[in-house]
Amino acid sequence: MTRIEEEVLAGVPVFPLPQVVLFPEVFLPLHIFEPRYRAMLTDCLDGDGALVIAQVDRESGRIADVAAVGVIVDHRPLPDGRSNIVVAGSARVRLDELVTEDLPRYPYKRARATRLDELDVSVADGDRAALVAAATMFVAEVKKHDPTFELQMPTQPTASALADICAFHLVVDSAVRQLILEELDPRIRVRMVMDQLAVQHGAMLREAKGTVLN
């Protein structure tokens, strides 16, 4: 994925979305329709294409401090001014503060952000294999209900990337996804994803058993 330069993070556009958590190494399709975000999209396309996708609480309006910065890699404009885009996740960031300068020029939120690098530690081969097994079993269970479901993986992803991809595509609870995003130790992150997939798999099995009994 494209590495975003530090100066870009000095005033990066922020797209707050409820229940959406972007991760590095994943692709997020979005539909842009609000006027302020159309303006944001225009500015992004005129610049380096970078923006932060941050989870926002529907009730309080609070934007998560930790988010992911990505780059627009596909843009499909529609005749009425709306657009479909795809954002490629690049890195974890911490939103240090919202930028308030020149507000009339920018109808959308911008922030000063700092890149968050994960710890330089190795994930045990056994843990990586266990995550692959947990994801494989969960996907197989999902496919019983939705035969069209597919989980696309890059060739030989690192354990860290594997955890992020599985969290993005397979973890249902956005609050749990946020916690996984915030964890900078890939060893812990791998276990968090495994544990959550086990919980979800068990819930699906219990639901299926209950359906049969009824």
What do these predicted regions represent?
Residues 1-214:
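N-terminal low-complexity, acidic/polar interaction/targeting segments
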